[in-house]
Curated annotation (Swiss-Prot):
Known tissue expression: Highly expressed in placenta and spleen and weakly expressed in lymph node, thymus, peripheral blood leukocytes, bone marrow, endothelial cells, fetal liver and tumor tissues. Also expressed in hair follicles, specifically in both Henle's and Huxley's layers of inner the root sheath (IRS) at anagen phase.
GO molecular function, one term: syndecan binding
Record family assignment: Belongs to the glycosyl hydrolase 79 family.
Top EC class of this enzyme: hydrolase
Organism phylogeny: Eukaryota, Metazoa, Chordata, Craniata, Vertebrata
Protein name from the UniProt record: Heparanase
Organism of this sequence: Homo sapiens (Human)
Record gene name: HPSE
Amino acid sequence: MLLRSKPALPPPLMLLLLGPLGPLSPGALPRPAQAQDVVDLDFFTQEPLHLVSPSFLSVTIDANLATDPRFLILLGSPKLRTLARGLSPAYLRFGGTKTDFLIFDPKKESTFEERSYWQSQVNQDICKYGSIPPDVEEKLRLEWPYQEQLLLREHYQKKFKNSTYSRSSVDVLYTFANCSGLDLIFGLNALLRTADLQWNSSNAQLLLDYCSSKGYNISWELGNEPNSFLKKADIFINGSQLGEDFIQLHKLLRKSTFKNAKLYGPDVGQPRRKTAKMLKSFLKAGGEVIDSVTWHHYYLNGRTATKEDFLNPDVLDIFISSVQKVFQVVESTRPGKKVWLGETSSAYGGGAPLLSDTFAAGFMWLDKLGLSARMGIEVVMRQVFFGAGNYHLVDENFDPLPDYWLSLLFKKLVGTKVLMASVQGSKRRKLRVYLHCTNTDNPRYKEGDLTLYAINLHNVTKYLRLPYPFSNKQVDKYLLRPLGPHGLLSKSVQLNGLTLKMVDDQTLPPLMEKPLRPGSSLGLPAFSYSFFVIRNAKVAACI
């Protein structure tokens, strides 16, 4: 059923109490709402368009963090675990370019930092009380900026060297995922090859044997962006060969305690012509053995991206055609196979400095989540939760950035049933709206409630009017705006005017709603994004 708004009088003058944005100067009062700033919405709520995973919003740890395994110990931070736990349920993908340059060495000795970490965990519940010894944490955090530069330089120069990691490294990674309530997906090295370019599975077998001995519950991938192996390693692997490699890995898993483990792939890059061709031949050869098709997407080159790019609906819409291409390939080869966005962020190459870690990045992130759900992608994995570059959710001091808070709100408010919302009229692209059933795990809400999330790329406030019969319902507003003089480039965020920050290392803040007067329009300030929960909506598709 398509539900349309009924005309009503424009809302009265509203005071913007949350600080200036866009054309409004400090202390200026906004002008009264003009007719063109009142926007009517249409909802389709008769049945869900799609059903996404409860782990729809998931995260990654880049494999380059293990280049020097000492830095994996940073994952032992209780604060980092608290932040990760806030996003559960979710997958934690350990992957990235370095996946194909990491070799497991079960005989490798633990580093001093690793030994210190494990010794400090003796006789205590590591998930509750585990922490990094203060001297070790201080040392690693002092050295991290230099290590980060090394990793980024290696990435830019495309000169990758093999690194080894130990049993201890695997233990640290698994412990972080397990204590955080995340399901680990581990990327195996696909560039280990025999003389005739068959995949050499011997190192993977060593890792499987070790993880099996520990009773670890892990899902698996093989390789990262195989479409660029020639550029990265001077090795060309076609899609058919890669499909055979996945069949070989599938057989290995079936012979081990991982016989019921999930296998995902092939983690190709953006679906340009050659990559789409590779994906098609891979799916024909090996698509039967994978549980979901994975691919990667970035909007921009991190070294050339601008703030204007982050706010440009033309840039946001590029994602739509990429999704369509992937689904065309999948439906022509393995119809019905689930599609995941296995790695994604705003800009490749580690993100865009002074942009990918600011409030401005949220426009891309929220829009990508909305479009992905609407178009049928089951899981979206955000690059990265913590690590090198500028696109992380949590910074080098373990402090959450704006996209973390946006992700946390999404987790708490947005359910798995995807509905349809649209803006009436022709000028829709700068005001982007998405609709789901509300997350019923949220104790504040109940089955039948709706969550609308909206992005305003206009330089004026827009007033959203809900369609009948929702126009007179109680609505809770969760408006996110940047804090401080840097505006859209701020790394701090306010929710309904209150600054979001952790209470302490073990405690996330309450996410306080702002109840709106029933029947009022939903004000969305210039260059902002917000969630609106429509209470007592009693939508049958959500029950």
